[in-house]
């Protein structure tokens, strides 16, 4: 009887130890899973802050599990840097990599160990322009939400050039915003505002003095967490000053700003390459060098948006092939004559 009791007690002890061991294993497993989940959630939040979205997430494949998503911050002839969850990283490039295939704002997958750039994800949109002497269009930026078309309230203000930028933004699918700078240096900034607003239906136009304390609030709606804007415009219009204001850079880290010539108000180049910068409000801004001559091509959709009023009126012309110059029954000419266009 005593032997039976001892055997039974020993059996219970073994079962109890086994249950305790299993319980401990479950606790450890739960803790590890919780830790991994929290880490994953934190990673997702950081990627979203960088501009990551479902569009890029859907491009990931099972074999990409060991690769790290990063966002291109600068592109040079022989090197590429990217923004990661831990900050800026210089990427390792293979011998076959052509840096002209990449644009600031691109999302790429990078090997975790050696930081080798493995592949670029498809772009949600891209900004590009034609350059003289080149067959291939030049990439300006990628995966941009809004395009800040910067011009100053002086001799630089050029409606024809602004229209080309608007066509560029419309074609790419970016929200165009005309930013009128240096309003403190003109007696009549309202006249510039009126001219800019008339360029396109529903166009957002803002006026600001980039050095004013509340200047950033004027642009806040386009600069929230995860949003990306690009700055374009001529040299000397205040893009670098605007960049410093948006990123709240200290004097030591600020982008150099240039003066303008007194004779024609044309500026000197202070930005020499495209680059991605964090906005104080949580978004990102892509700075671009000043462009004095902008060529656009293959932007038919962008032009239709730019001249939406004319497109609508043209459908009411008497003749389908109306050139809107001399034909009778031209709705465009009639609208121009009575002041509605």
Model-predicted segments: where are they?
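Conserved lysine of the Walker
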Residues: 239
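N-terminal accessory targeting/assembly segments
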Residues: 9-12, 16-159
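Canonical P-loop GTPase G-domain recognition
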Residues: 185-235
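Phosphate-binding glycine-rich loops and their immediate beta-loop-alpha structural context
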Residues: 140, 150-201
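Helix-rich effector regions associated with P-loop NTPase G domains
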Residues: 31-41, 63-66, 100-114, 120-146, ...
């Amino acid at each position: 009887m005593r032997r039976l009791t001892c055997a039974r007690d020993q059996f219970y002890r073994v079962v109890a130890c086994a249950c305790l061991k299993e319980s401990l294993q479950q606790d450890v497993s739960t803790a590890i899973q919780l830790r991994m989940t929290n880490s994953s959630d934190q990673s997702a939040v950081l990627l979203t802050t960088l501009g990551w979205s479902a569009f890029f997430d859907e491009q990931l494949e099972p074999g990409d599990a060991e690769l790290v998503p990063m966002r291109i911050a600068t592109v040079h002839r022989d090197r590429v840097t990217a923004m990661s969850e831990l900050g800026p990283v210089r990427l390792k490039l293979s011998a076959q990599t052509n840096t002209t295939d990449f644009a600031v704002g691109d999302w790429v997958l990078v090997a975790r160990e050696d930081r080798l750039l493995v592949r670029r994800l498809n772009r949600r949109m891209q900004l590009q322009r034609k350059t003289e002497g080149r067959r291939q269009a030049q990439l300006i930026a990628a995966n941009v939400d809004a395009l800040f078309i910067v011009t100053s309230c002086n001799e630089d203000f050029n409606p024809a050039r602004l229209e080309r930028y608007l066509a560029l933004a419309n074609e790419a699918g970016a929200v165009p915003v005309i930013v009128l700078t240096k309003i403190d240096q003109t007696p009549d900034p309202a006249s510039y505002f009126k001219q800019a607003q008339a360029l396109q239906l529903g166009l957002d136009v803002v006026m600001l003095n980039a050095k004013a304390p509340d200047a950033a609030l004027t642009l806040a709606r386009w600069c929230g967490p995860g949003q990306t804007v690009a700055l374009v415009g001529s040299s000397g219009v205040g893009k670098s000053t605007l960049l410093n204001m948006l990123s709240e850079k200290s004097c030591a880290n600020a982008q150099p700003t240039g003066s303008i010539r007194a004779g024609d108000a044309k500026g000197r180049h202070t930005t020499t390459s495209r680059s991605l910068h964090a906005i104080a409000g949580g978004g990102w801004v892509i700075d671009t060098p000043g462009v004095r001559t902008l060529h656009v091509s293959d932007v038919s959709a962008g032009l239709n948006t730019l001249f939406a009023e004319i497109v609508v009126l043209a459908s009411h012309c008497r003749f389908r092939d109306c050139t809107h110059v001399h034909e009778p029954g031209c709705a465009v000419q009639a609208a121009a004559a009575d002041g509605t266009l």
